[in-house]
Amino acid sequence: MTRRVFAILALSLSVAVVSAGPSRYGFSDRIERHLFPEVTTGPDNPSWSPDGTWIAFSMQGDIWKIPSKGGEAVALTHGPAYYFEPAWSPDGKSIAFTMDTDGNLDVGVVSSDGGVVTRLTDAREVDLEPAWSRDSQDLFFVSARGGRGFDIFKLHVADRAVTPVVSDPGDQTQPAVSPDGLTLAYVSPVQGKLGTGGIWTRPLAGGPPTLVHYEESEYRMRPHWTPDGKAFLYDSDDMGSNDVAIVPATGGNPFVITNDPMGEFSPAPSPDGASFAFVSNRTGPMTLEIAPIGGGPLGSWRHLAIGPRRAAVPTGLVHATVVDAYGAPMPARIEVKASDGRAYAPDGGFARVIAVSETHYFHATSAFDLDVPAGPLAIEALRGFEYRPATTTVDVKPGATANVTLTLRRLVDAPAMGWYGGDTHAHDLHQGRFGLTHRTLFDESLAEDLHLTNVLIHMDGTRIMGRWADLTGKPDPLSTPTHIMQFAEEFRGSLGHIGMIGIKTYVLPLTGGENNTAYAQVASDVPYLDGARAQGGLAGYMHPYTRASQNPAAPNPAQWDGSLIPVDVALGKGDFYDVESLYSDELGSAEMYYRLLNCGFRLPATGGTDNFPDVWRDPPPGTDRTYAKVSGPLSVASWLAAVKAGHTFGTTGPLIFLTVNGREPGDELQLGASAPTEVTVKVTVSSIAPVDKLEIIVNGVVGPPIPIANTPTYEGTVSVPAGGWVAARVVGPPSKHIADSYAFAQTTPVYVVRNGKTFVSQDDARFLAGVVDAIWARTMRSPWRSDAERAAFKAQIDQAKAVYVRLAGGLPGS
């Protein structure tokens, strides 16, 4: 997909350009999915009333409060805006919050008894994370209005005057005012360290900051002063799961006080200092818990149930069921819009957003219940790319239950033709706040009708993303004969990422080119590409390129120096190439794909999403997927064999079936010297989203667009006088039914061999030789651990360069 924002990590020459995710607010995906507040189906961000009798929290897009000893939960806000991050004023009269309205994040306030919401900020830059001064006259908040990332500002509530408070390099977030009102705590980067920063303090009257505590964090710390001002409660990931920890305000060794295998977040000390509230994801969605200030195991927690509830507007219940054409229950992705314009998800569900279209969704196994504002409710059910979306509208009556059934009918039955859709690049845990289990993960894939989900365990910074023990080389026990989930590995190097699927053991280390670690040097992909093959698996290229040539008439080889793919392919390595991926641009990736094919390399076209299924602001697995034509019953081995043979196409949504003289993608068509120069191309396209055009590609030359909106089947001829390859692709506009940026599908070619000779484009070979030179120019000053390591890497560069020089018939000018 085309990235709207790019986050450049220019830490050294060994660090590649990392593209950011689809952006609603104009920031990287990491910021938008981890720093920014999220819509949750359970309680989040608890905040005590000053007298300790109430706890405010956010849930389902509103601010609620509940007696701290338990009882009825009362909503203080209602749509159409979403409300998050409540902060109870020290005088007890008001609750400030972050609000999402008009496509932006702002700070607002409401009476602690509910009522009219007052929007306090309306700058075009995002404002969030409000924290009160001790006299309840000012709000400290985080904003991008400084133009250099996130800084901390102070807003005087009476006249809305805003003044800067902390404007250091990097992002300053999560402000908290000391009990005596004299010191501000916040989170800010620590030079030379990974993560989003440590806990700092700064006198509000002026003075230098003091680093209290550092650990590799991901916008999760949210420090809160204890009432005596002597310590901070904060969220720690040092033990491999998010836990509440306590550290002295003057610095020192922290203690973890909620050591549970799942995650605990957003600790808030009670006003008397005897206990603290927090949220836990041990059951999946957030639950509200209270524990003694000294912490303790699960048995010492007091669960605060959120029910009964008193909403701010009349509500009703919707009971919905999704079925197939025969009436059998069917898992699906669900999108709803209520009468207030907001999206809702069932209690206990996982509310998520496809950021590229700002579409809210959740997954359902079949039946689900929704408590929503009275009035018309629009519901849509989707299931992958082979079923037509089903939509309906129901009129929700106050206090009543409405029953609705959505029927999903097939657009095409690809498995009946031997084609099975899978994802080469899904993920598991990635620091999201939802308590993702194997069951939840599998149910996501089932609802998306993914027949093979390759879940890649990887490393982000120095932290493992996933569960070490999941990589067994066997399908997960939840798998069925038609829908398989199997864990695999991703190597995240500074010059591209390698996916290893169908493997039994890890190829280590999991990372390379990571500054401030023992693996800061550039790493070769070859051990990973070879390591997967040695185990009987496949290794391929994830999210290859983020953009097409800036000047197609005179492409610059240096633009393509961020990936080792041209080196690896020249060395005979690599089993597949994800033309479609959320974290790359399909047209840009296709441009390099065609150049590699034009040098005689046979590389299957595939698709892999690179989604994070426990993160709320991310698309589902199978957003980008690979269709492989399997011989015999579906299994991991048969699907991988089909990919290896190139019987594939990659897609963001459209299904495209190609034959050339009756041959299918990955096949070879041998023609004699006297055979006709023209071959017959047949293409059939089916798509749940609009598509504009079909294009036939011959030896890298994209043919004239063929309109297919009303004629999904095409038959014609193309000329291949010198042999080479013939492939097809389909392109369409953005669509709410496409979770990537636009509709796109690319087949693997049918390879045409005329008179026994392989077609090679000398121009493309020369260009790729230049790309290899550019890669070495980028990496030659990497912090190599030894001269031998540098020499070994350079030898691979030289070997790849020699391949392209040979294919070009010599250097440029030959």
Please state what every model-predicted region is.
Residues 146-147, 191-194, 413-416, 492-493, ...:
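Short glycine/serine/proline-enriched coil/turn segments at secondary-structure junctions
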Residues 325-342, 348-352, 356-370, 376, ...:
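C-terminal functional module detector
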Residues 53, 74, 118, 255, ...:
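Solvent-exposed, polar/charged alpha-helical surfaces in well-ordered, non-transmembrane soluble domains
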Residues 20-317:
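Sequence signature of WD/YWTD-type beta-propeller architectures
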Residues 116, 141, 154, 161, ...:
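Long luminal/extracellular ectodomains of secretory-pathway precursor proteins
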Residues 417-605, 609, 615-616:
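Catalytic cores of extracellular degradative/oxidative enzymes
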Residues 7-16:
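Bacterial N-terminal signal peptides
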Residues 1-7:
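Bacterial N-terminal signal peptides that target proteins for export
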